[in-house]
Amino acid sequence: MRQEEVVIRGGSVVTSYGIVEADVWISGGNIRRIAKDSLPKEAKGTARPNEIDASGMYLLPGFVAMPERPHGRIRRLPEYLDAIRLLIRQGYTCLVDTLQPEAWMDHPQVRYQTAMHFNNLIDYTWQVELPASRLNGETVRRWCGEGYRLLRVVVRRPEELFRMDWETISPLLTSYKVMLQLRVPKEAGLNGEERLRLHRQWLSLCRCWQIRTWVDGEASLTFEEFDPYYHVFRLRGEDCERALRHLAGHWFRSLPVIAALDEVQVNLRRREWDPESLLCLLVRVASTNAAKAAGLYPRKGCIIPGADADILFLKKEHWLTKFVLSTILNLSDFLLPTSVMSKGKWLYRNQCFASTIGMGRCLLDIKPYNYVI
């Protein structure tokens, strides 16, 4: 059955580089047109589209969730739905979850590990977590052949990097265009200097073999000294604020950084933060850049024709009051969008969640090499 056409009128569309007043046409779960109509149009013989009044609201693209705790491992359905609804409440409309297969698992057993996401309310994709000792040609060929394009490599000691068979796996990774993510667990027991040295060695190897990768950003890492295409940095806390200040001072400069919205830390009392500019920067780092790194752009992370209609409705008064000097609100209070829409359907509205269990799609046709961040 064809989905009803929807027009969102009167809203302010937030992009990575600015805010524009425009109406948004949605059909079949996708954005079809963005423009500002001065006169209403009526076509004979066609049904009038359903109009949504977004006056006094910002329209933001949905954010990309990258939780540390795999949601697919939750085995009780009520607990799982509560976790997904919390993500929606925070403004996330897409999830990058982690699959942690054991070496003995075959295809049906791996599929069982992903079964809980059949109840997902939002679209999701997978990154496969593997220890460095298991990252060989056979393993890479298996997971790439099954459609996975994000591999997270767990490294505990620096010497594990040089035991990896880079000559064998690099042609496979570049052929399938697979993004690698480095994870150094806290229980590895590395101090700050050892962790930083390991990160630098990893980045150097990935640049040498022309493999795109993302790592956790460290305060000691200087982004300018690394490759702007092959190296992507995931930032948290104060490191994220440092990057946002840099972008605010160099508005059109490219910087390969991503962040999860709930991990952004910004001191709103600093005078250099313009409310709407900061909102654009949050969209750039936590939505557009995150979608590019995960290979989901331009389907996710933007409000443009052809993209999925994943839209957050945020009242301007709720955002702008954070910058009044008398308030003590933190950035975390932003995690309260008025309404959330996914693929043109309401997920959250009037403080109520829609009964859309199972609406989320598994997105494996991702392309993490397509865009510079």
Task: Report the location of each language-model feature.
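Active-site microenvironment of metallo-dependent hydrolases
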Residues: 1-22, 26-27, 35-37, 84-90, ...
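Short hydrophobic beta-strand segments
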Residues: 2-10, 48-53, 215
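Short, ordered loop/turn segments at secondary-structure junctions
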Residues: 39, 69, 99-101, 129, ...
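Metal-associated gating/positioning segment near the N- to mid-region
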Residues: 39-113
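Active-site neighborhood of phospho(di)ester-bond hydrolases with catalytic His/Asp-centered motifs
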Residues: 60-67, 94-99, 127-128, 216, ...
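Active-site mouth loops of central-metabolism enzymes
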Residues: 65-78, 125-136, 155-156
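Mid-domain alpha/beta scaffold segments of enzyme catalytic cores
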Residues: 101-138
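Histidine/acidic residue-rich metal-binding segments in metalloenzymes
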Residues: 109-115, 134-257
